[in-house]
């Protein structure tokens, strides 16, 4: 199942707030897509081989095309880094924000959070990618307009949560014609695929994800 189909199946709930920069929305107002944790998979494709693999591609998928759309937005992302840091401190730190946005399991440890973009059918969405010892999770920076089945527009935060045990593969990719354009493609065992791009700290994000998957494997 492609990301476009995933996006179409997300159910929107009316937002309790309209603050377009809040990372602490009412949990009931968040646009959710969560992968259930009913099964376990191995993180090795073969003896001694990590399931995280690198690849280069000349063709553009949905995620690759979205990278081209970013353009000046990448510069804006860097400029927002300092202001985001101040906002996080004001709200009590990443740990507090993470616990407000997502259900946290017992003994779950948050490793890091990284600014990036998630590819959707509506275009790239800016937000934070959280990496913990149990899952990866994304929440959009700004609320987005979504129409209900009745046609009523409301503002919601786009949220994705993927348990590590449901990840089947992670591709570290780049455009050979534009090497600075790098992406992380995450594929679940249910054949959902998620494209993340426009990282302020791309390699650090990949290394953190690799650490999380290796720890979960043990």
UniProtKB/Swiss-Prot annotation:
InterPro entries in the record: GEM-like, GRAM, PH-like_dom_sf
Pfam families hit by this protein: GRAM (PF02893)
Residue ranges of domain GRAM in the record: 96-174
The family this protein is said to belong to: Belongs to the GEM family.
Protein name: GEM-like protein 6
């Amino acid at each position: 199942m492609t990301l476009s189909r995933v996006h179409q199946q997300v159910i929107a709930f009316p937002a309790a707030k309209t603050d377009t920069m809040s990372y602490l929305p009412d949990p009931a107002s968040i646009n959710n897509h969560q992968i259930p944790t009913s099964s376990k998979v191995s993180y090795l494709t073969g003896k001694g081989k990590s399931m995280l693999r690198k690849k280069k591609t000349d063709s553009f998928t949905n995620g690759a095309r979205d990278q081209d759309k970013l353009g000046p937005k990448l510069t804006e992302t860097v400029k927002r880094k300092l202001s985001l840091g101040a906002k996080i401190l004001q709200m009590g730190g990443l740990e507090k924000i993470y616990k407000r946005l997502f259900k946290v399991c017992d003994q779950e440890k948050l490793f890091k959070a990284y600014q990036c973009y998630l590819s959707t059918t509506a275009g790239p969405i800016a937000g934070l990618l959280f990496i913990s010892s149990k899952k990866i999770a994304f929440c959009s920076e700004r609320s987005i307009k979504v129409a209900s089945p009745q046609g009523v527009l409301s503002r919601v935060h786009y949220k994705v949560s993927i348990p590590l045990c449901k990840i089947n593969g992670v591709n570290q990719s780049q455009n050979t014609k534009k090497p600075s354009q790098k992406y992380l493609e995450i594929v679940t065992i249910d054949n959902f695929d998620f494209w993340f791009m426009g990282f302020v700290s791309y390699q650090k994000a990949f290394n953190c994800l690799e650490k999380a998957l290796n720890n979960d494997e043990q």
